[in-house]
C-alpha cells in the first residue's frame, strides 16, 4: 500500500528547531541502518552531517517524515575547471516506503534545480547503492560519471587525520541548464568544502 506523501520545499533558514529535531531523528534511523558511525552526526537535534543544505525537499505522511533530499549550490573543480553545481545529498527514504516508488517522486527535485539556475546537479553515493541509482540513469534523469574520485574537507577537525579526504564513490551528474556532454573531463572532483 502506497503512503500518501506530501512534498514541501523548505529553505534552511525557515526551518524551526522542531523541524531539525524531527529530521535528526529521521536521519539517525535511516543512516543508523548502515551503522552507528553513520548516525552519529545526527545526534542532539542536528539535521546535517557536513555542509548544511541551502534548501530541502521533505516528504511527509501521517507517520512523519517519509523522505528527504538536501540541495546546496556550490562551486566545484573538475580537472582545471571551476563551475557552479547544485550538490544533492542527505537523501533518505523511510524503510517502510522503500520499493514503493517514492524515490521516483524525487523527480520534483528537477524543477527546483531549474529555478536555482544551475548547469548541473551533482551527487555521490556508496557503491552499494549502484543498482538503485542506475534506475535514474536509465530514465535519463542522471548519468554515472565513471572513474572519478571526490576530494572533500572533513566536517570536523581531527588531529590524527588529514584535513581532506579522497573518496572512491559513485558520482551522479544530472544536466539541468547544460547538456551532459558539457560536463568537464577529469578524474578528481574537488568539492572545496565538506560533503553535503
Curated annotation (Swiss-Prot):
Class of enzymatic activity (EC top level): transferase
GO molecular function: acyltransferase activity
EC id: 2.3.1.-
This protein's record includes keyword Kinase: no
InterPro entries according to UniProt: NodA, Nodulation_prot_NodA_CS
Function according to Swiss-Prot or TrEMBL: N-acyltransferase required for nodulation. Acts in the production of a small, heat-stable compound (Nod) that stimulates mitosis in various plant protoplasts.
Family statement: Belongs to the NodA family.
The protein's name in its UniProt record: Nodulation protein A
Amino acid at each position: 500500500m502506497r503512503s500518501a506523501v506530501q512534498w514541501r520545499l523548505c529553505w534552511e533558514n525557515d526551518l524551526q528547531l522542531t523541524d531539525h529535531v524531527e529530521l535528526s531523528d529521521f536521519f539517525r534511523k535511516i543512516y543508523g541502518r548502515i551503522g552507528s558511525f553513520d548516525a552519529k552526526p545526527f545526534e542532539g537535534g542536528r539535521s546535517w552531517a557536513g555542509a548544511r543544505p541551502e534548501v530541502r525537499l521533505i516528504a511527509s505522511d501521517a507517520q512523519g517524515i517519509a523522505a528527504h533530499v538536501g540541495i546546496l549550490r556550490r562551486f566545484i573543480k573538475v580537472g582545471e575547471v571551476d563551475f557552479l553545481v547544485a550538490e544533492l545529498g542527505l537523501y533518505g527514504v523511510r524503510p517502510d516506503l522503500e520499493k514503493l516508488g517514492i524515490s521516483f517522486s524525487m523527480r520534483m527535485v528537477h524543477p527546483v534545480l531549474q529555478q536555482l539556475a544551475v548547469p548541473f546537479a551533482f551527487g555521490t553515493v556508496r557503491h552499494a547503492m549502484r543498482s538503485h541509482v542506475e534506475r535514474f540513469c536509465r530514465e535519463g534523469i542522471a548519468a554515472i560519471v565513471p572513474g572519478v574520485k571526490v576530494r572533500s574537507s572533513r566536517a570536523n577537525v581531527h588531529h590524527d587525520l588529514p584535513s581532506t579526504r579522497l573518496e572512491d564513490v559513485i558520482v551522479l551528474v544530472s544536466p539541468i541548464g547544460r547538456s551532459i556532454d558539457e560536463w568537464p573531463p577529469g578524474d578528481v572532483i574537488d568539492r572545496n568544502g565538506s560533503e553535503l
